[in-house]
Amino acid sequence: CSFDTATNTLTMTDKSEGVSTVPTKYDLRERQRVSLIRDQGSYGTCWDFAATSALESALMPEEQLLFSVDHMSMSNSFNVNQYDGGEYTMGMAYLAAWQGPVYDADDPYGDGVTRDDLAAVKHVQQMLIIDGKDYQGIKEAVFKYGGVQTSLYSTIASSKTKTPYYNKQTNSYCYMGQDKPNHDVVIIGWDDNYPK
């Protein structure tokens, strides 16, 4: 900044452009902002789990809620069953229409039955869509809001699946191919110095 005494003017220059607003390492587990880890079983409900987990994370740590995956996957406006799979826009539509979320205790997962008489216990007012390769934007969203739902291509069908994309030494999965995403997960942190 500089001050011109002749014109009595203060000039300030913003030099912060390009400066990261997030740390090089961040983990929502260390801040009690990760919901219960659940198993989708053989159903194609990863998109529901990712959507509900991201919402639960956004409300933490102040509110420790568990939302129904069953309700989102069966009481939405998309005529699909739990084996058909889905995608993030289906979860967004369900939440934006205030069809849910509802509590998991009121509509538990895996019984193949849902209740249509349940009202949304939260009203989602705003959702953020981040460009797929905007890693800085993803980090900022995790840092500010909590878990971020994302889609990836996975070659892993079960814990017994062997794949060249999974590194057991670093517990990491990295697929850089061109196949379309087939699985949804929630990003809960990062480490810029993680061994690759």
Question: Where do the language-model regions lie?
Answer:
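Catalytic-core signature of thiol
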Residues: 1-196
